[in-house]
Amino acid sequence: MSEIREARLQKANSLVSKGFASYAESFSVSHTTKFLIQKFDYLENGQEEDFSVSLAGRVMAKRVMGKIAFFTISDQEGQIQLYLDKRMINCNLENQKLLSFEDIKEIVDIGDWIGVYGTIKKTNKGELSIKVEKWEMLSKSLQPLPDKWHGLTDIEKRYRQRYLDLIVNPHSKNVFKTRAKCISFIRQWLDNRNFLEIETPILQSEAGGAEARPFITHHNTLDIPLYLRIATELHLKRMVVGGFEKVYELGRIFRNEGISTKHNPEFTSVEIYQAFSNYVDMMNLTEELIKDIVFNVCGSLVINYQNKEIDFSKPWSRISMKDIVKKYTGIDFDSFSGDFQSAKQAVKSINVEFSNKVNSMGRLLNEVFEQKVESELIEPTFVIDYPVEISPLARPHLDNKEMVQRFELFIVGRELANAFSELIDPVDQRERMQLQQSLRDEGDHEAHCIDEDFLNALEIGMPPTGGLGIGIDRLIMLITNSPSIRDVIPFPLLKPEITSNKNEKLPLNEVK
């Protein structure tokens, strides 16, 4: 590696010695590869078009055959071939200060960024090309690309050095284009329905809105602990109290929890709140939004995910947690009539393991669902009516205070959305937060804190409201057929690589 780097560095220096920059300040690009390929697709083999272009890109392939050379360069939109003829490039050297054909042959390596000026032609073999008249070095690459056309096969290195992954794996680049398109579409969809995007604090004095362990930092001037937000819920609800009836925020959430193919400590979600609505309204909104996203991005409501066909056009199932647990396990929680010991024995008989934290019928029901049912829900399924113990911010059912008006959406065995009719009764909310605080005081780091300002806001008065949260990363996984959340986050959190000396980090390019 050091020999290759040294040779390339010498080439960069030779450019400077000739009076040219090896790292340009700018370059005027007239068109993209995508535009040129679409516009001139009609050309016949061997036909030329006197259409002037200037194009910049990274060199991905290089073939020199005497006085002719063929390069392939890549820009954000795709790839195109360069046709370089020694006579054409060298004909103006006496009148202008230009780089020669010999220069491009000797100095340019795969991985370099170059800019070219020329016209359009289609080769005799049918390859649309730019017939280069002159060229410039834009940025000299000092390190070679991995495996050229074969891609970056080391999965962990793909995540650590995403820039290399994007260069050599076209699929990865398409994933992040799709991600950007989805996020843009969601914002447009909500804006068109008169939702207002709100920016809530990332640094908060209280971490609330979800059962999750927060990241803690410290503000030096104020000398107080602060928390990275674990949800945007409580601040968005404050906006509803203030009179904004339809609000949302699409942004980053931080939870100090485990890492898996489904979890990253830093992730993206959209939370949506709509006054005068309940969880049924939010179910309808969720189904409409996700169907529109899938169709807009994929062009169809039927997609394939990891060899499973998902049909979004069919009516989405809506079933209570109790009923779906009974369906998949045979256990009817209503039959226990509150007898927790009998329920535990029945649950143990189907090999469900649980900790002492599972100390109520509702938590036990949820444990059975997560271990025995969740992974079976392949087609879009709304699981509704959750236990109150695990839903401290949701409105209870009038006819059954032990259950709340909440749903979660599951697709391919993963939770994709979570929503409920919001709890707007300040007295009930205080009682639930006090219970959560007592659990926290006993060592449950994921339990909610009491947020006095939020409770005060509820006492001012909050209208009936439906709230919804959608995990953007999991949605992108589904749409792009990606098996891991790390595939759809540009820079996922990874444990730093270190040498045997734990205090000495290796440069990434020298990590074996």
Curated annotation (Swiss-Prot):
Binding site for Mg(2+) 2: 415
Cofactor: Mg(2+)
UniProt keyword terms in alphabetical order: Aminoacyl-tRNA synthetase, ATP-binding, Cytoplasm, Ligase, Magnesium, Metal-binding, Nucleotide-binding, Protein biosynthesis
InterPro entries in the record: Aa-tRNA-synt_II (IPR004364), aa-tRNA-synth_II (IPR006195), aa-tRNA-synth_II/BPL/LPL (IPR045864), Lys-tRNA-ligase_II (IPR002313), Lys-tRNA-ligase_II_bac/euk (IPR034762), Lys-tRNA-ligase_II_N (IPR044136), Lys-tRNA-synth_II_C (IPR018149), NA-bd_OB-fold (IPR012340)
Assembly behavior: Homodimer.
Binding residues for Mg(2+) 1: 408, 415
A Pfam family per the record: tRNA-synt_2
EC numbers: 6.1.1.6
Protein's UniProt keywords contain Lyase: no
Cofactor details (free text): Binds 3 Mg(2+) ions per subunit.
Protein location: Cytoplasm
Catalytic EC class: ligase
Catalytic reaction list: tRNA(Lys) + L-lysine + ATP = L-lysyl-tRNA(Lys) + AMP + diphosphate
Membership in a protein family: Belongs to the class-II aminoacyl-tRNA synthetase family.
Protein name as annotated: Lysine--tRNA ligase
Organism taxonomic ancestry: Bacteria, Bacillati, Cyanobacteriota, Cyanophyceae, Synechococcales
